[in-house]
Structure formats: structure tokens, C-alpha cells
Amino acid sequence: MDKERKNDSKEREEGCKQSSKVREEGYKQSSKEREEGCKQSSKVREEDVIGTPKETPKAFPKQGKCRTNSGRKQDEMDRQNLTLLTDLYELTMMQGYYRNAHRNATVVFDAFFRNNPFGGGYSIMGGVEQLIEYIRELHFGAEDIRYLSSLGIFGKDFLDYLHDFHFTGDIYAVPEGSVIFPREPLVKVVAPIMEAQLVETAILNIINHQSLIATKAARVCYAAKGDGVLEFGLRRAQGPDAGTYGARAAIIGGCVATSNVLCGELFDVPVAGTHAHSWVMSFPDEYTAFKAYADIYPDACILLVDTYDTLESGVPNAIRVFQEMKKNGVKSRHFGIRLDSGDLAYLSKKARKMLDEAGFPDAIISASNDLDENLILSLKAQGAAITSWGVGTHLITAKDNPSFGGVYKLAAIQGQDGKFLPKIKLSENTEKITNPGDKKIYRVYEKATHKIKADLICLNEETFSEDKTLLLFDPQEPWKKTKMHPGEFELRELLVPLFQKGACCYTSPRVMDIRAYCNKEKESLWEETRRLVNPHQIYVDLSKKLYDTKIDLLSSLSQVDADAENIEN
């Protein structure tokens, strides 16, 4: 890694004009090598899909050997140096740590969120693959250091340290596509304090965005009740990255395809689309436009029927083309119409009747036009004859809740004896008080139904067994308790290692396999938790030991405040 970093610096100083291409030797993985190297991952076992880590080797491979299972051009989008994708105060704090005695202290940071977006009962984990790529490429190039030097706030000693910087810690995360809940650590970073501090902003940027869009997609797909949902939002997204990674997250959340061709190539996911009004308008008349399209794309013949008049012109002309195809022996596997304006419930029912009477009961009726989960649910309730939904703006921008709200907080710091000392953040708002210590998560399933009963956060040294009675209690109202006896429940640890001692030890599944895993995860939710309005909230409980640790810290800090107040008085 040091050799690669020096090569990068030398090339930058020589004025290499091909700055858009990644230059380090370790980054020149060809697509052929990637495909050959991932053959064992192409047949993803169930444990691979849920993110079970590979067996930890005695000597971890170099970061350049860590692989993902995305499309062949993944390097060009993910393999870029995003080290300066951070807030300035992360770097100023790093320099502060560097010049203080605890510069080498190992700490634990947790990334978590406080409330489900959209008023929902659950969220979906997204962005883990991009988090891995970010950490792998983490280093300060010569141009980065020159820029930081130009700010006039960083000393030469600190900049020299950054020149040789690389990540050496451990990172754990909930597997991508998992159902997640508030206040539990989605990502846990165990690393020297300067390293753990630096990665805060990028981790939140990556995880917040894709988790938000995956969650929105899951809600939209739930409203569609088994109909196919297509992600159509690229042109309305906040830039290329948001459009492309957002489409990736939408697929994970349940969408069957995206209109984003770059996303399709990068992540090997299905792409789909029909045609625009401009296609129809460019021909002398609507029928000629439809016929020309059907001649070129007989197996993907979805005709947009609302350019002029949906029921008087569009649907009749589409039927005429379908009849001619049938007469000429053209068997289309995928044909129908798309509605993009007007009263979608009324128009779809009228169009369905016209198509059925013409002998085309298998014709698809697709709809778009500012759809979201609430409108789809309403259209379903009205009996709309729509079986395919194109969802754009409201999905790709998460329009009604455009931020996920994830945070990154210090939870523990290692003492001289090697033990982690728990740390807690107080707040005037009870929900903002953090859970201290080095922690892990158990998911508790009701064995009879395999539905999620609760999530249990405990200290890392604790273990729980399905062979012993499990006591669950609400940390906000601890008198509310539930006992689960052996045979009534199953346990699963959620956090899996991504990096150990700075080396990647995890292979991310392909996006479509993550999607399949996510669909299974959603099946583990109670119907009352999945409903869109006023859902049942799954309990996120604390172990007795973690709860007592938290209360003791709160009490001790309250006593310190009281003593200080007495001194002032």
C-alpha cells in the first residue's frame, strides 16, 4: 500500500494528464480478473447473501484483494479517492488528537439513527458495498496534502503523518438489505481515535443516502402488493451519484428494474423503459409512431397512450397495432400500454375493458406520473387496473422525508489496561442520550412464526443462548417485561466484520442477491409493522448489564453536575 501511495504521489507531481483514471498498481484490477476472482461468489449461498463473513484468515489479505460482486465497471465509479469527502472539523480534530497524549487511543464509534423515516415501522440497510470501497481507497495523495497545506491551519508534522496514513482498525456492520431499527449500531468502528474520527462524515453520507432510498423503495413496493415497481427517477435525482446509487438502493429495496443504464452496467441489475411523448410527436400520427415502435421492439412493446387523447386515440391505436402483430404471427412476450397523466384509476379501468374486449387480457397497463406509496395504495383501493408502476421523483429523492438522520457517536475508549471504558452523551432530549460501551446486536425471532420479536443490544462480552430463558424489557419503561423460554425463540447476531486490522475480510453479494435477501428480511416483519400508517414499532431492548451501565453513567454524571453546582453556590 505504501508503494502504491508513493507511486501515486510521483505521478501527480509529474503532472499526469490522465487524472480521471485510477493510477495505483493495486487499483488496476481488470474486469476479467474481477470476474475470475468472483467465480466462487457467483453462486451465492444463503449465508453469503445475508452477509456471513468469510473465515478469518491468520494473515489478512492486503486491501487490494478485497472484492465486490458488482458489474464490470465498478472500478470507474467506486474506486476513487474520497478521503477528502469529509467535514473540515474531522481534520482539525485529527490534528488536535495528534498533538495530545491520547492520539493512539483505540475507541469505539457507533453509527445509528433515531427514528424510522416516513413515519414507518422499519428501515432497510443500504450502502455497505460503497462503505467498503471508501475504506479500501482511504489515503491522502500529494494533491490532497498540498491543498490541506494551502489552508494554513495544518502543521507540517501533521501533514507528514497524513502522507503515510491508512486505516488500521476494525469495522462491523449490519449486512446490506437487512431490516433495521432505531438506536441500534448499524456500523461499529473500532480503531485509533484519529482514524475513527476521519471516517465519520463519509460513513454517514453513504449509509444515510442508500438506507433512505432502499427504505422508500420497500414502502412503495409494499403498496404495489406484488406488482412490479420500476425506478424511473434519474432525471429528477440530485446529481449523477444520487441517481445511480439511489437506483442501486431502490433495487435492493424491492424495485424490479431501473431506467438508469449506468446503474445497470455498474451493478448488473435489470434496466427497463418504454418511450417518450417525443417519439409519438416526431411521427405524422400516433398510429404510425406505435407501429414503428412495435416493428423495432416486438418483445418489449409498451406504448405510451396519452400524448393526444388516451381513450379516443391512444388506446384504440395501440389495440390496432396489437391486432396487426397478432395477425402477422408476431408473438410479443411483453406488450401493453403506459398511462402518464389524468385520472389513473378511471383511465386504467376503461383501458382494461377496451383491451379485454379486443382480445388482449394479457396486455400490461403501466402507470407513472408522480407516484408514491400513498398514491399507489389509493389507486389500489379504487380498483385501478394497473399492474406495473413507474416511480420516479418521489422515490429517488425520498421527497416527503429527504434525509435519513443517521448519527455517529463515541461509545467507548480503551484504557491503559486494554479494557474499553464506556462513554455516554447526555442531552436535554431523552431520545438523544446514547447507549454506551462496545456493543453488539441480537435479533430475537419468534420461533413459531419466524417473525421479529425484538432486537437486543448488549455489551460485546455478553452472550445469549436459545437454551436459556431470555428476559426482554423496554429500556424507556423497564417495568414492561417479557420472558421467552427455550423453544420459543431463535437468536441471530446482526453485526458482521467488514475490516479487521485494516484489511477487508468480507465479500459483498451481488445487488440482485442482496435484493432477494431483503425480500426475505421483509417477510420476517409482522404485517402490523409493515403497514404504511401508524405501524407497530418493534422493540429495541437493552440487556440488563448494558442498561445498568447506562444508568450508572447517567447517575455519576448527574452527581458531578450536582457537585459543581454546590461549589458555585
What positions do the PLM features span?
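Glycine- and Gly-Pro-enriched alpha-helical subdomains that act as flexible
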Residues: T274-I365
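Catalytic cores of alpha/beta
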Residues: L371-A385
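Long, intrinsically disordered low-complexity tandem-repeat segments
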Residues: S9-E46
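Ala/Thr-enriched low-complexity intrinsically disordered regions
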Residues: T52, T56-A59, T68
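Glycine-rich phosphate-binding active-site loops on the catalytic face of alpha/beta enzymes
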Residues: A385-S403
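Glycine-rich beta-to-alpha transition loops that act as phosphate-gripper elements at the mouths
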Residues: R235-A237, I365-E373, G392-H394
